[in-house]
Amino acid sequence: GGLPYAAFLAPGLLAAQGMQSAAFESTYPIMARIAWTRVYAAMLATPIGVRDIVVGQLAWIGVRLLLTTSVFFGTMVAFRSPVAALAVGAATLTGLAFAAPIMAFTATQRNDQSFNALFRFGITPLFLFSGTFFPVEQLPAVLQAVAWLTPTYHGVALARDLALGVATVPGVLVHLSVLVGVIGAGLAAALVTFRRALVV
């Protein structure tokens, strides 16, 4: 009578998909608007400022994440927990926890050559080793500690707990605190790096 693997896997994939979508949305499209098409520079010729651009871009990524994770969640009809739909919010927050700091990083780059390394050595290992496919408790102790520090782990755990109806208030608060903290730090960094990239 253990948990079916599909029930374990699906919420983890939901959160991990949010991470992957956000990572893409925060790299090439942002680089294009900063350096290739200079859309952001054109926007600064209007009454809006850098803060409006950064917050607006992050909000738009959030809307896209909400839509894509909602579609993915539609395939998870087997979850009957009354709070299972909140897993969509967890996946969206997971994505935003990557979008904000990656946007900040992208604004420091002169070209897209570093993005392959970001995906290969950052996003892919996080996708594989943050609890999406198997419990992080199966990792060596050092890697467990590393996993627990990542927003992916907290997003996956939060989405899974909500989807399965086993979330506890302390657990939810810990996971939310990490995700919101990373979003806030990433947003603060993005405001600085975007200003440096866009204001000459």
Per-range role (PLM):
Residues G1-G2:
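Short, hydrophobic transmembrane alpha-helix segments
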Residues A7-T27:
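Long, hydrophobic alpha-helical segments
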Residues S21-T46:
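Transmembrane helix boundary and interhelical loop/hinge segments in multi-pass membrane proteins
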Residues I30, Y40-M43, T75, F105, ...:
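Hydrophobic alpha-helical interface/terminus motif in multipass membrane transporters
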Residues G49-V50, P135:
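Short coil/turn motifs that cap or connect alpha-helices
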Residues V50-R120, V169-L191:
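Alpha-helical transmembrane segments and their short interhelical loops
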Residues F127-A185:
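Membrane-interfacial helix-loop-helix junctions in multi-pass membrane proteins
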Residues F194-V200:
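Short cytosolic juxtamembrane segments of multi-pass membrane proteins
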